[in-house]
């Protein structure tokens, strides 16, 4: 009961052409079996995080239908709970529809959480991680905030809508900035972090006072000098779904058996809602391609 989980919605800089007009990225079909949001929720429930808040900015229907009460994610039915939370004031100008505005609209629900720590993960990135281990690494280090990052060597042509971390030799975070595509080796920030709930709430309030356009990443970047913010490296498969090419590439990459092994582990199930429908029949004249 040390931490509760937050699954955040995608930022205003992220847009998957042709698909996001109808549903949020978390509700996108993935590998023909899952939805993208299954990965962060399964990571949390596998890590014994039983209280989870899923934030939805717009077009909630498909996420609500898929996630529902969350029973299919193996959440403890007595002590656990999955909440779907919405932004009350969806602004016409998208620049103000930030994660901070969504948290502010649901401050009452946040304030009621009795857990000392909060683990935040995005609904638009695909990876496997033991959040319990991540939380203990954070507590043992004595840092104020711990951010998860993935080291990549193709940042010039990929991850262009992601943020990257500036790290010192001790893995202290000096900056969180947009990836400008000017360097191939970068530490991509996975929009995943852990901190004390108390600090999280105070950062939300401070961001609100600074600017209505501020995101959690913006306020964390401001705090790099005054707070002890550290980075922890993620190993294994990682995909950030922030535009159509990255969505296609993530699905295709997992046709590779080695990549699939990095994401799916025998003792780390990815839960999803099952829909029992008639199986597809392929006849002699069918032409099927990947």
Regions found by a protein language model. Give the residues of each.
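Left-handed beta-helix
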Residues: 1-9, 198, 208-290
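A short, N-terminal amphipathic alpha-helix
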Residues: 33-54, 66
């Amino acid at each position: 009961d040390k931490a509760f989980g937050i699954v955040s919605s995608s930022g205003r800089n992220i847009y998957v052409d042709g698909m996001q007009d109808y549903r949020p990225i978390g509700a996108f079909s993935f590998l023909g079996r899952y939805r993208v949001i299954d990965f962060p929720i399964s990571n949390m429930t596998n890590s014994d995080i039983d209280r989870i808040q899923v934030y939805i900015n717009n077009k909630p229907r498909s996420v609500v239908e898929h996630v529902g009460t969350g029973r299919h994610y193996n959440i403890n039915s007595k002590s656990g709970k999955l909440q779907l939370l919405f932004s009350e004031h969806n602004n016409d100008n998208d620049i103000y529809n930030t994660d901070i505005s969504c948290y502010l609209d649901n401050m009452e629900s946040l304030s009621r959480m009795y857990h000392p720590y909060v683990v935040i993960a995005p609904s638009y990135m695909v990876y496997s991680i033991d959040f319990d281990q991540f939380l203990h690494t954070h507590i043992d280090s004595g840092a104020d905030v711990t951010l998860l990052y993935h080291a990549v060597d193709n940042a010039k042509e990929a991850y262009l809508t992601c943020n990257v971390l500036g790290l010192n030799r001790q893995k202290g975070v000096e900056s969180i900035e947009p990836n400008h595509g000017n360097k191939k080796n970068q530490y991509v920030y996975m929009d995943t972090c852990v901190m004390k709930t108390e600090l999280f709430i105070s950062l939300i309030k401070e961001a609100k006072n600074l600017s209505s356009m501020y995101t959690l990443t913006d306020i964390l970047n401001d705090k790099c000098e005054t707070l002890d913010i550290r980075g922890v490296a993620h190993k294994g498969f990682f995909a950030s779904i922030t535009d159509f090419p990255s969505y296609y590439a993530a699905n295709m990459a997992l046709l590779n058996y080695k990549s699939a092994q990095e994401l799916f582990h025998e003792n780390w199930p990815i839960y999803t809602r099952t829909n029992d429908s008639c199986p597809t029949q392929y006849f002699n004249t069918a032409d099927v391609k990947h």
